[in-house]
Amino acid sequence: MAESWLRLCGAGPGEEAGPEGGMEEPDALDDSLTSLQWLQEFSILNAKAPTLPPGGTDPLGYHQVPGLVAPGSPLAADPACLGQPHTPGKPTSSCTSRSAPPGLQAPPPDDVDYATNPHVKPPYSYATLICMAMQASKATKITLSAIYKWITDNFCYFRHADPTWQNSIRHNLSLNKCFIKVPREKDEPGKGGFWRIDPQYAERLLSGAFKKRRLPPVHIHPAFARQAAQEPSTAPWGGPLTVNREAQQLLQEFEEATGEGGWGTGEGRLGHKRKQPLPKRVAKVLRPPSTLLLTQEEQGELEPLKGNFDWEAIFEAGALGEELSSLEGLELSPPLSPSSHGEVDLTVHGRHINCPATWGPPVEQATDSLDFDETFLATSFLQHPWDESSSGCLPPEPLFEAGDATLAADLQDWASVGAFL
């Protein structure tokens, strides 16, 4: 055994030595760790090599070496297996049969007896099972326990299955709109309520249309359907707008309340523009301006006002023209330039009028004010803004006296001007 192991490991004849040579023979060698015989039982040996077509070539030289299946196989790199005949091996994991996952089971055949077969689940929804139990009871209402009993009597699968399916039955009865709960009367014996099918969903349940929950159909109120039929759909870019009877009645009541006309004229331009397809907008509309409430005759009278006004005719007519005509002889000199130092020249009918003293401020005062502003800006931060002890305030009496004197002088000058008018 030791000699064969050393020969496989590549030991030369000079290196082989017996117990006399000083080398000890191992007590027990595990052949399973060094033997390569398990490769002969590998499943790749069972695979057939691809056959070449007649007249074909072998560019890679697969068939030149006897015993080789493919260059990538585990046996191709093992020189100990070269030239050995291929023997059929045992099936391994690649040849094991695979079972289908539990969720992808084949559909049950049509000839399955669900009353006796406990392994096949019936292909019906819980809502359909409830409906079938109610139809088989021949009564207008049925209890929950009666539904359980009918399902277990007719389907053997539910007799052996986990009892959690009863929770699904209760949930369908409570959440599905196809079933209606009927309370038990006082004189009826027993506990709990009854259940029955809504008549409008009975046919659909029996035909299998309610295997999955669906939303109930949408019902349109007859009043809205009639209103939609009366109001024709008009494009926003073409065709005149139409008003239904309710909107016309609201318009009439609005005109009577305001006491003004012009909104009901359907032939005019304003009538077409003010008509709205929805009565809500008409009810909430604000009061229109006064120009929109005028009739066509009044609007025709206002048309000349849109042109140019004859100002000369307006000034010449009436008392206004007489008062303004007296001012034609009044001659006013052009305004003084900033550099001029002269007085204002007022001449009425060749007679000179002196200018009031308040009209011509001296130039020196302006220059003094500039100096005062600069001085005030420079010294403003040194003084407290609310200094009550400062004596720079002037008494109000001289100011009022000076103002009265100036006002009296102005009135006297204007009285002299009015005498010439």
From Swiss-Prot:
Record's compositionally biased regions (Gly residues): 11-21, 259-268
Keyword Metal-binding: no
InterPro entries: FH_FOXJ1 (IPR047512), Fork_head_dom (IPR001766), FOXJ1 (IPR047513), TF_fork_head_CS_1 (IPR018122), TF_fork_head_CS_2 (IPR030456), WH-like_DNA-bd_sf (IPR036388), WH_DNA-bd_sf (IPR036390)
Location of this chain's protein in the cell: Nucleus
Stored PROSITE patterns: FORK_HEAD_1, FORK_HEAD_2, FORK_HEAD_3
GO BP term, pick one: actin cytoskeleton organization
Polar residues bias spans: 90-99
Disulfide bridge partners, by residue number: none
Pfam (any one): Forkhead
Superkingdom of origin organism: Eukaryota
Residue ranges: DNA binding: 120-210
Any one GO cellular component localisation term in the record: nucleus
Keywords from the named record: Activator, Cilium biogenesis/degradation, DNA-binding, Nucleus, Transcription, Transcription regulation
GO molecular function, one term: DNA-binding transcription factor activity, RNA polymerase II-specific
Residue ranges, annotated region (Disordered): 1-32, 79-110, 256-277
Tissues expressing the protein: Pulmonary epithelium, testis and oviduct.
Function: Transcription factor specifically required for the formation of motile cilia. Acts by activating transcription of genes that mediate assembly of motile cilia, such as CFAP157. Binds the DNA consensus sequences 5'-HWDTGTTTGTTTA-3' or 5'-KTTTGTTGTTKTW-3' (where H is not G, W is A or T, D is not C, and K is G or T). Activates the transcription of a variety of ciliary proteins in the developing brain and lung.
Family of this protein: Belongs to the FOXJ1 family.
Name the UniProt record assigns to this protein: Forkhead box protein J1
Lineage: Eukaryota, Metazoa, Chordata, Craniata, Vertebrata
